[in-house]
Amino acid sequence: MTNELVYEGKAKRLFKTEEAGVLRVAYKDDATALNGVRKESFAGKGELNNQITSLIFSHLAEAGIESHFIRAISETEQLVKEVSIIPLEVVVRNVMAGSLAKRLGKEEGEPIPNAIVEFYFKEDALDDPFINDDHVLYLEIATTNEMDEIRQAARSINKVLQELFTQMNITLIDFKLEFGRDAAGNILLADEISPDTCRLWDKETNQKLDKDVFRRNIGNLTDVYTEVLNRLKQVQN
């Protein structure tokens, strides 16, 4: 196993492996907010996100949705296909919350009849600004056909995840996706899907089961992530 670091982000490190085109992802215990301005470490967070992401990506694969995920290899690590990340954060919104509620002057919790898909330019120095299709084309991030493919994939993923989280008695409020191109130019789902990247509310109590408990100081992060993992395991068995 090689320890040559390829990339380090806020929540993960990527390392080379002996196999060409395969990387090792190591999940960190760090949690960040305000685009990295606020940072804390929570013992066990990396393990929780690795397990949750591994289960969700496996579930998506069973539904016919391809991703970079290969398999988990330890409590905090997984193997993934190497992709070139497209610098877009793709946000799918099913319920008004967060920045969208503020931007549109709506109350949090208002259902969105047809999910809204948004693009954000993945650039920390600019605080990941909201952009439209014309910006994407101007920045040469993706072609029109690729944007259509990404949107369709995001909506397909949303459908599968909504059904999954409903079984867990959780409302999928919104979530962030990232995509990458493999060596052949195919677009694959990448990054992670976890309470770090999703807003999740308990269907009965509206308790927040995601990183908002850290952002807003309203609960224990590892407790709610553990709750999500336990519910996920129950419906997967």
From Swiss-Prot:
EC number(s) recorded for this UniProt protein: 6.3.2.6
Superkingdom classification of source: Bacteria
Gene name, Swiss-Prot/TrEMBL: purC
Enzyme class: ligase
Pathway, per record: Purine metabolism; IMP biosynthesis via de novo pathway; 5-amino-1-(5-phospho-D-ribosyl)imidazole-4-carboxamide from 5-amino-1-(5-phospho-D-ribosyl)imidazole-4-carboxylate: step 1/2
Reaction(s) catalysed (UniProt annotation): 5-amino-1-(5-phospho-D-ribosyl)imidazole-4-carboxylate + L-aspartate + ATP = (2S)-2-[5-amino-1-(5-phospho-beta-D-ribosyl)imidazole-4-carboxamido]succinate + ADP + phosphate + 2 H(+)
Family of this protein: Belongs to the SAICAR synthetase family.
Pfam families (alphabetical): SAICAR_synt
Protein name stated in the entry: Phosphoribosylaminoimidazole-succinocarboxamide synthase
Organism: Listeria monocytogenes serotype 4a (strain HCC23)
Keywords: ATP-binding, Ligase, Nucleotide-binding, Purine biosynthesis
PROSITE patterns referenced in this protein's UniProt entry, alphabetically: SAICAR_SYNTHETASE_1, SAICAR_SYNTHETASE_2
A GO MF label: phosphoribosylaminoimidazolesuccinocarboxamide synthase activity
GO terms, biological process: 'de novo' IMP biosynthetic process; cobalamin biosynthetic process
InterPro entries registered for this protein in UniProt: SAICAR_synt/ADE2_N (IPR028923), SAICAR_synt_PurC (IPR033934), SAICAR_synth (IPR001636), SAICAR_synthetase (IPR050089), SAICAR_synthetase_CS (IPR018236)
Lineage: Bacteria, Bacillati, Bacillota, Bacilli, Bacillales
